[in-house]
Amino acid sequence: MLSKRNLAMMLIMFGVVLVLFLSTAVMKEYFNDYDVNHAALEDRISREKSEFATGPRQHVVYVGAQDAGFYPPILEWAGYRKMSFYEAADVETGIAQADAYEKADAYLLLDGDALEQDTQQAAELLTAYVREGGTVIFCSLPDYQTIQGCDTLRQLLGIQKLRAESVELLEIWLYEGFLLGGEVCYAFDELQIPERIDMGREIPWYDISARTKSYMVGYVTAREKGDAGLSNEDMPAILWRSNTGNGCVFAVNGDYMEGEAALGLLDAMVYESREYALYAVVNAQNLSVAGFPTLTSENEEAFRQVYGFDSQQFCRDVIWPSLVAATESGGWKISAFLSVKQSNATAPEANMDFFTEYLKYYNEESAEAGIALGRKEDTDIRRSLTEEKAKLDSMDLTYAFTGGYIRSENEEQLSRLLKPDGSMDILPDMRTVVTEGGSEQAVFSWLTDQITRQSITVDGYQHTYMDNFRLKSLQTALGYSNVQADMYRVVWLEDRKDAWECVSEELAANIDTHWKPFAAFDKTTITESDRRVRIFLNERITSSISDTEAGRQITVQVENFNNEAWLMLRTHGEKPKSMEGGTWKRIEEDAYLLHLTSDTAAVVLQSDLENYYYEGM
């Protein structure tokens, strides 16, 4: 039987536990400064317009058409690397311009169509240029017949045999050590998910010589290979380097240089042609959730048929918890771009009390609240944004909206929101705008002198072969990605596959799996990323290597330095031994992320090999 004394002790213990529980909840609520955007507390970094202390150190000469798919990313790459850019109408003019620079500082980029006329003369000029130490990059190849008809061109490209004008591939292998992220096989057999296959599998079959190095190769079936008595070395080449004299030629067999993928390929080619590579990166991985939350019951009838309750409840009770669960293991930070109302056709009034709840959730999860700039198929985004801002102001909060998201159909209206000085009058705190991107839109850039633009780089609900290829390329070039989770698609679903239970499963699997090789890069909110983008766009990196008593030392200088900078260091068998002016971390073999805390830094390298030998130098 329970004594009075024991009963009293139990009641006291229950009381203490209850008080502790309630006090914890109260303290959590009290210290939750949810109406503060912590990412906006850092000062806004201004656009640097002053000239660099010295002229461009590196130069790009492009020979080809401006309507080629690789022309925009080449321009973008040259801008990111602070290189001078020169265009030439023909090979002879291009070589004359490239000859004005030191061979180690110039890159001659070619559209294969530029060699369709006067092929023999162009091939001879290019061969002489490469033998003297020049670096030539064929962004696309001349057509099969042109290569077949010119032995000098075949020798320059390192092609020993032309086997077929077109061959259907069973697999494409991208070997490790070129783009970051390790080796990968893109297979085309019946076991693969058809929706993921978006790489072309038919290419000309060029058999390259022993003086080349392959980075990406296609494979035919074992039967085809066996019947022809071929080995792996005879398989169709896609990306390779050919050495001639003191220089080298890079060749791309296919359309892989079109779009954002070109950025990483170009940096990888520079790395493969030099003793080491050192260049600026952003070091930011973003997850942008567009149109979340919606504070109004949208698409009510259809939504209740599919989910059983309205979109407001669904966002709060289903989507938010599953977003937190999906991002937890990878340490992702959510940037959620709210919409008071997603469509002008939506009749019900917004429940603004939900917004305060979300701000508390975000603060607990280190997430950031952004704002959607306009609505679905909006004819006047200025009017709708003014209405939404008035609703938010009625909450009497001090939260600074520094990140915005605009749908592609509304981008043409973006200028209506901008003041002459480049700021937004409706949202004066705005620092960066996320756009849905496109083949000719830069990964990021200055929208105005006050605001940056950051493009979506990948759809989080899918991961095709080309998505994977672009991801590896952008991580190689920029250490950057901006993953989109589109809630407009979920709320206004047109197909059962757009339902949250379907797309959320894909999102969780994709961001957990495909970003693992890039865990060294930081996860950021969109405003944290904006700060790093501004640092990247303003700065220029120069470096040199020399032998010292401590070992081979890379000396780094950063112009327009702003407290910190992130750099990619890629070596050939060496690794950092010590560093002054910053720290480093390993990304993968021969690839390191440097964090500079001074405008000058020095990295001493060490090698496990007694006699260091770099192939091709």
Question: Where would I find each of the regions flagged by the language model?
Answer:
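Catalytic grooves of carbohydrate-active enzymes
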Residues: G254, Y276-A277, N283-T294, T327, ...
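Aromatic-Pro/Gly-enriched surface loop or interdomain linker
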Residues: M9-K103, V281, L295, I319-W332, ...
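Metal-dependent polysaccharide deacetylase catalytic core of the NodB/CE4 family, i.e.
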Residues: V61-G64, V130-E132, F138-E168, P293-S297, ...
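Active-site beta->alpha N-cap acidic-glycine motif
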Residues: D255-Y361
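C-terminal beta-strand-rich structural cap/linker in extracellular carbohydrate-active enzymes
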Residues: Q117-Q120, E588-M617
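An acidic, glycine-rich "communication" segment
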Residues: C139-A222
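A glycine-centered loop/beta-turn motif at secondary-structure junctions
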Residues: Q58, K103-A104, R196-A284, Y480-S481
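Short alpha-beta junction capping motif
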Residues: A100-G149, N246
